[in-house]
């Protein structure tokens, strides 16, 4: 029996297409996706989108057992994977360039674990599963987003923003950081580290509002620097557990008095933010207004 050449060509093309689908892992369900979900700074600050994503997930990822307990209502009944914060150690460094054998071994192990975790995520998504990595606050501020850099660019993925420490701390003091009377800039920074080019001393020279994330923070050093660039009566505020109605606390002082009157040594590690700037007192007032905007609104 003779075959129609067009029919035969169609069968061949269909077979090639099917083989490609099987080969690249697609076509199983087509609904697999990797999410990074910002959980907010408190259990009740998760967004509606975040809740829906977690409900739809087959696998959830957390950094620790503590986080699993905090988000137990969301994690219940899900397969749980762990991605500890320590996996960020030496990310971006080539272990082969490290001379110290012990440090090199740590870097090699971290790189290997990151790669294995990325491979697991890819395999799960290729199988049509939804993987949701839950992260406190907003993942775009010191979160673990490096996994997206290790995954194929065409892998379906999405970041669900969360209410971060900056937003929650600003709400706690009931003042908006961009309003600094005669400044508009807001500098988000952290403790200095060796090799850093934009060190805090340089940033302070602008006189802008400053927001310090306090990991490994040296208060005496930072305030000795602040005192060289800000008037002693410049207001400061430390917000502990920003956004948590049960434990949130605001400690107020000034650049000149802080080290003398504040018990900063007993602040809970990595659970507080330092705000520095005139906005804490003046609110939304401007020194001379903004004439261009005022003219637009007067028309």
Residue ranges and their predicted role:
Residues 2-11:
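Bacterial N-terminal signal peptides that target proteins for export
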Residues 10-20:
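Bacterial N-terminal signal peptides
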Residues 25-160, 272:
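Class I S-adenosyl-L-methionine
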Residues 29-36, 103-110, 123-131, 148, ...:
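A contiguous loop/helix-start segment that scaffolds small-molecule binding in enzyme catalytic cores
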Residues 58-60, 80, 176, 187, ...:
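Short, well-ordered beta-strand core segments
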Residues 67-69, 88-90, 164-168, 185-187, ...:
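Short gly/pro/ser/thr-enriched loop/turn and capping motifs at secondary-structure boundaries
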Residues 78-85, 156-160, 177-184, 231-239:
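Short hydrophobic/aromatic-enriched beta-strand-loop microsegments
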Residues 135-207, 248-252:
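Class I SAM-dependent methyltransferase SAM-binding "motif I" and its flanking Rossmann-like core
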């Amino acid at each position: 029996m003779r075959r129609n050449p067009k029919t035969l060509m169609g069968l061949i093309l269909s077979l090639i297409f099917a083989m490609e689908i099987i080969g690249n892992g697609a076509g199983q369900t087509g609904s697999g996706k990797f999410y990074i979900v910002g959980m907010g700074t408190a259990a009740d600050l998760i967004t509606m989108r975040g809740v829906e994503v977690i409900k739809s997930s087959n696998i959830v990822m957390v950094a620790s057992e503590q986080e699993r307990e905090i988000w137990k209502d969301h994690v219940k009944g899900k397969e749980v994977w762990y991605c500890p914060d320590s996996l960020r150690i030496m990310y971006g460094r080539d272990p082969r360039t490290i001379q110290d054998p012990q440090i090199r071994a740590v870097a090699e192990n971290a790189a290997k674990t990151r790669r294995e975790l990325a491979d697991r995520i890819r395999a799960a998504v290729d199988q049509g599963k939804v993987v949701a990595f839950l992260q406190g606050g907003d993942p775009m501020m010191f979160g673990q987003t490096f996994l997206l850099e290790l995954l194929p660019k065409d892998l379906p993925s999405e970041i669900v923003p969360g209410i971060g420490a900056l937003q929650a701390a600003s709400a706690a003091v009931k003042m908006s950081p961009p309003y600094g009377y005669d400044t508009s800039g807001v500098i988000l920074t952290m403790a200095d580290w060796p090799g850093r080019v934009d060190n805090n001393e340089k940033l302070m020279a602008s006189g802008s509002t400053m927001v310090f994330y306090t990991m490994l923070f040296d208060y005496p050093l930072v305030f000795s620097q602040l005192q060289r660039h800000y008037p002693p009566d410049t207001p400061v505020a430390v917000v502990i557990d920003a956004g948590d109605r049960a434990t949130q606390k605001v400690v107020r002082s000034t650049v000149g008095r802080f080290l003398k009157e504040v018990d900063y040594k007993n602040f809970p590690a990595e659970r507080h933010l330092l705000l520095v700037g005139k906005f804490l007192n003046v609110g939304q007032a401007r020194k001379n207004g903004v004439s261009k905007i005022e003219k637009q609104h007067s028309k």
